[in-house]
Amino acid sequence: MPSELDLRLAKATEMLTATGAPMALTAHHAFGVDLPMVAVAPPAMSHYFAYFCAQHGDTEFIVDGDQRLSFKQTYAAADRVAKALVKLHNVQRGDRIGIAMRNAPSWIILYMGVLMAGGCATLLNGWWQGAELAAGIDDVGATLVLADQPRADRLSEVGYAGASRIVALDVAAPLEQALAPIWGTADLSDVALPELTGDDLATILFTSGSTGQSKGAFSTHRAVVQGTFNYIVQ
Protein backbone atom coordinates (compact mmCIF):
# COMPACT_ATOMS: atom_id res chain seq x y z
CA MET A 1 0.00 0.00 0.00
CA PRO A 2 1.45 3.42 -0.95
CA SER A 3 2.35 5.67 1.96
CA GLU A 4 1.06 9.20 2.42
CA LEU A 5 4.41 10.47 1.13
CA ASP A 6 4.11 8.27 -1.98
CA LEU A 7 0.66 9.68 -2.68
CA ARG A 8 1.85 13.27 -2.23
CA LEU A 9 4.79 12.69 -4.59
CA ALA A 10 2.52 11.07 -7.18
CA LYS A 11 0.11 14.01 -7.01
CA ALA A 12 2.94 16.55 -7.33
CA THR A 13 4.37 14.65 -10.31
CA GLU A 14 0.95 14.53 -11.96
CA MET A 15 0.58 18.30 -11.52
CA LEU A 16 4.07 19.01 -12.90
CA THR A 17 3.58 16.80 -15.96
CA ALA A 18 -0.03 17.66 -16.83
CA THR A 19 -0.95 19.37 -20.11
CA GLY A 20 0.10 23.02 -19.89
CA ALA A 21 2.35 22.40 -16.86
CA PRO A 22 6.11 23.21 -16.87
CA MET A 23 7.05 19.55 -17.43
CA ALA A 24 4.12 18.48 -19.61
CA LEU A 25 4.50 15.09 -21.25
CA THR A 26 4.46 14.04 -24.86
CA ALA A 27 4.78 10.60 -26.45
CA HIS A 28 7.70 9.13 -28.38
CA HIS A 29 7.00 5.92 -30.26
CA ALA A 30 9.79 3.37 -29.87
CA PHE A 31 10.09 -0.38 -29.35
CA GLY A 32 6.48 -0.75 -30.47
CA VAL A 33 5.02 1.41 -27.70
CA ASP A 34 4.44 5.09 -26.91
CA LEU A 35 6.91 6.23 -24.26
CA PRO A 36 6.14 9.28 -22.09
CA MET A 37 8.69 12.07 -22.56
CA VAL A 38 9.08 15.55 -21.06
CA ALA A 39 8.09 17.78 -23.97
CA VAL A 40 10.32 20.78 -23.15
CA ALA A 41 13.48 18.66 -22.91
CA PRO A 42 16.09 19.46 -25.58
CA PRO A 43 16.77 16.86 -28.28
CA ALA A 44 20.39 16.20 -27.33
CA MET A 45 22.88 16.78 -24.52
CA SER A 46 24.80 19.29 -26.65
CA HIS A 47 21.75 21.58 -26.53
CA TYR A 48 21.39 21.10 -22.79
CA PHE A 49 25.06 21.90 -22.16
CA ALA A 50 24.73 25.13 -24.15
CA TYR A 51 21.53 26.21 -22.39
CA PHE A 52 22.56 25.29 -18.84
CA CYS A 53 26.02 26.84 -19.06
CA ALA A 54 24.60 30.03 -20.61
CA GLN A 55 22.02 30.27 -17.82
CA HIS A 56 24.66 30.04 -15.10
CA GLY A 57 27.43 31.90 -16.92
CA ASP A 58 30.02 33.20 -14.46
CA THR A 59 28.80 31.07 -11.55
CA GLU A 60 31.54 28.82 -10.20
CA PHE A 61 31.06 25.28 -11.49
CA ILE A 62 34.24 23.24 -11.01
CA VAL A 63 36.49 23.47 -7.95
CA ASP A 64 39.70 21.44 -7.96
CA GLY A 65 42.28 22.58 -5.44
CA ASP A 66 43.24 26.11 -6.43
CA GLN A 67 41.64 25.74 -9.86
CA ARG A 68 38.23 27.34 -10.40
CA LEU A 69 36.11 27.17 -13.56
CA SER A 70 32.80 28.90 -14.20
CA PHE A 71 30.03 27.38 -16.30
CA LYS A 72 31.00 29.72 -19.13
CA GLN A 73 34.67 28.71 -18.96
CA THR A 74 33.80 25.03 -18.80
CA TYR A 75 31.55 25.26 -21.84
CA ALA A 76 34.20 27.20 -23.79
CA ALA A 77 36.78 24.51 -22.99
CA ALA A 78 34.37 21.73 -23.98
CA ASP A 79 33.56 23.51 -27.25
CA ARG A 80 37.28 23.79 -27.96
CA VAL A 81 37.76 20.09 -27.23
CA ALA A 82 34.83 19.17 -29.49
CA LYS A 83 36.17 21.18 -32.41
CA ALA A 84 39.66 19.78 -31.91
CA LEU A 85 38.33 16.22 -31.87
CA VAL A 86 36.60 16.84 -35.19
CA LYS A 87 39.42 18.72 -36.91
CA LEU A 88 42.59 17.22 -35.43
CA HIS A 89 41.51 13.72 -34.41
CA ASN A 90 39.00 12.96 -37.18
CA VAL A 91 36.17 12.08 -34.80
CA GLN A 92 33.05 11.18 -36.76
CA ARG A 93 29.44 11.11 -35.63
CA GLY A 94 28.82 7.93 -33.65
CA ASP A 95 32.50 7.09 -33.05
CA ARG A 96 33.13 5.45 -29.69
CA ILE A 97 35.60 7.63 -27.79
CA GLY A 98 36.97 6.12 -24.59
CA ILE A 99 37.60 8.16 -21.44
CA ALA A 100 39.89 6.39 -18.97
CA MET A 101 40.99 8.56 -16.05
CA ARG A 102 40.47 9.51 -12.45
CA ASN A 103 38.05 12.23 -11.41
CA ALA A 104 39.38 15.57 -12.64
CA PRO A 105 38.15 18.75 -14.36
CA SER A 106 39.52 17.32 -17.60
CA TRP A 107 37.14 14.33 -17.31
CA ILE A 108 34.09 16.60 -17.20
CA ILE A 109 35.28 18.76 -20.09
CA LEU A 110 36.25 15.76 -22.22
CA TYR A 111 32.87 14.11 -21.62
CA MET A 112 31.06 17.25 -22.75
CA GLY A 113 33.42 17.74 -25.68
CA VAL A 114 33.07 14.18 -26.96
CA LEU A 115 29.27 14.47 -26.98
CA MET A 116 29.34 17.91 -28.62
CA ALA A 117 31.63 16.51 -31.35
CA GLY A 118 29.05 13.80 -32.09
CA GLY A 119 31.07 11.03 -30.48
CA CYS A 120 29.79 8.43 -28.05
CA ALA A 121 31.52 8.90 -24.68
CA THR A 122 32.68 5.44 -23.66
CA LEU A 123 33.34 5.53 -19.92
CA LEU A 124 36.07 3.06 -19.02
CA ASN A 125 36.28 1.98 -15.38
CA GLY A 126 39.16 3.81 -13.74
CA TRP A 127 39.82 0.83 -11.45
CA TRP A 128 40.39 -1.53 -14.35
CA GLN A 129 43.86 -2.90 -14.97
CA GLY A 130 45.49 -3.05 -18.40
CA ALA A 131 43.88 -6.24 -19.70
CA GLU A 132 40.42 -5.11 -18.55
CA LEU A 133 40.85 -1.70 -20.18
CA ALA A 134 41.99 -3.34 -23.41
CA ALA A 135 39.01 -5.72 -23.39
CA GLY A 136 36.56 -2.86 -22.84
CA ILE A 137 38.09 -0.77 -25.61
CA ASP A 138 37.97 -3.63 -28.08
CA ASP A 139 34.47 -4.72 -27.02
CA VAL A 140 32.92 -1.43 -28.14
CA GLY A 141 35.28 -0.72 -31.03
CA ALA A 142 36.57 2.58 -29.65
CA THR A 143 38.57 4.53 -32.24
CA LEU A 144 40.23 6.87 -29.74
CA VAL A 145 40.91 6.70 -25.99
CA LEU A 146 41.60 9.77 -23.87
CA ALA A 147 43.50 8.53 -20.83
CA ASP A 148 45.37 9.95 -17.89
CA GLN A 149 48.97 8.79 -17.64
CA PRO A 150 48.42 5.94 -15.13
CA ARG A 151 45.70 4.35 -17.30
CA ALA A 152 47.76 4.88 -20.45
CA ASP A 153 50.65 3.15 -18.66
CA ARG A 154 48.44 0.19 -17.77
CA LEU A 155 47.58 -0.28 -21.43
CA SER A 156 51.23 0.03 -22.39
CA GLU A 157 52.24 -2.56 -19.79
CA VAL A 158 50.00 -5.20 -21.38
CA GLY A 159 51.23 -4.30 -24.85
CA TYR A 160 47.91 -2.98 -26.09
CA ALA A 161 48.02 -2.95 -29.88
CA GLY A 162 44.36 -2.69 -30.81
CA ALA A 163 42.71 -0.38 -33.30
CA SER A 164 42.19 2.44 -30.82
CA ARG A 165 44.65 5.33 -30.63
CA ILE A 166 45.59 6.30 -27.07
CA VAL A 167 46.11 9.97 -26.16
CA ALA A 168 47.75 10.35 -22.74
CA LEU A 169 46.95 13.45 -20.68
CA ASP A 170 48.51 14.92 -17.54
CA VAL A 171 45.24 15.70 -15.76
CA ALA A 172 47.06 17.02 -12.67
CA ALA A 173 48.43 19.93 -14.73
CA PRO A 174 46.58 23.23 -15.27
CA LEU A 175 43.77 22.81 -17.78
CA GLU A 176 45.50 24.46 -20.73
CA GLN A 177 48.46 22.14 -20.32
CA ALA A 178 46.38 19.06 -19.47
CA LEU A 179 44.33 19.27 -22.66
CA ALA A 180 47.11 20.48 -24.96
CA PRO A 181 47.46 17.00 -26.55
CA ILE A 182 43.82 17.34 -27.63
CA TRP A 183 43.60 20.88 -28.95
CA GLY A 184 47.22 21.81 -29.66
CA THR A 185 47.66 25.28 -31.16
CA ALA A 186 45.41 24.92 -34.21
CA ASP A 187 42.88 27.53 -35.32
CA LEU A 188 39.51 25.88 -34.66
CA SER A 189 37.27 28.79 -35.61
CA ASP A 190 36.25 27.17 -38.91
CA VAL A 191 34.99 23.90 -37.38
CA ALA A 192 31.25 23.21 -37.58
CA LEU A 193 29.93 20.77 -34.99
CA PRO A 194 27.20 18.29 -35.97
CA GLU A 195 23.53 18.97 -35.22
CA LEU A 196 22.62 16.02 -33.03
CA THR A 197 19.26 14.32 -32.54
CA GLY A 198 17.82 12.17 -29.80
CA ASP A 199 18.67 9.05 -31.80
CA ASP A 200 22.42 9.73 -31.79
CA LEU A 201 24.49 7.65 -29.38
CA ALA A 202 25.59 9.56 -26.28
CA THR A 203 27.29 7.23 -23.82
CA ILE A 204 28.42 3.69 -23.20
CA LEU A 205 28.58 2.42 -19.62
CA PHE A 206 29.86 -1.03 -18.75
CA THR A 207 28.00 -3.74 -16.87
CA SER A 208 29.40 -4.81 -13.51
CA GLY A 209 31.07 -7.94 -14.85
CA SER A 210 30.13 -9.87 -11.70
CA THR A 211 29.36 -13.04 -13.69
CA GLY A 212 31.62 -12.52 -16.70
CA GLN A 213 33.45 -9.93 -18.74
CA SER A 214 31.92 -6.44 -18.53
CA LYS A 215 29.98 -5.45 -21.62
CA GLY A 216 29.21 -2.00 -22.96
CA ALA A 217 25.60 -0.80 -22.79
CA PHE A 218 24.75 2.30 -24.83
CA SER A 219 22.33 5.17 -24.23
CA THR A 220 21.08 7.62 -26.82
CA HIS A 221 20.99 11.38 -26.31
CA ARG A 222 17.23 11.12 -25.86
CA ALA A 223 17.63 8.59 -23.06
CA VAL A 224 20.23 10.65 -21.19
CA VAL A 225 18.31 13.92 -21.58
CA GLN A 226 15.02 12.36 -20.49
CA GLY A 227 16.72 10.67 -17.54
CA THR A 228 18.04 14.08 -16.48
CA PHE A 229 14.61 15.69 -16.78
CA ASN A 230 12.97 12.81 -14.90
CA TYR A 231 15.38 13.56 -12.06
CA ILE A 232 14.44 17.26 -12.23
CA VAL A 233 10.74 16.39 -12.00
CA GLN A 234 11.35 14.19 -8.96
Language model regions located:
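Conserved ATP-dependent adenylate/AMP-binding module captured primarily in the ANL superfamily
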Residues: W128-E157, G227-Q234
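Conserved AMP-binding/adenylate-forming core of the ANL superfamily
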Residues: M37-A41, A50, D58-Q92, R96-M112, ...
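Conserved AMP-binding A3 loop
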Residues: S70-K72, A202-F229
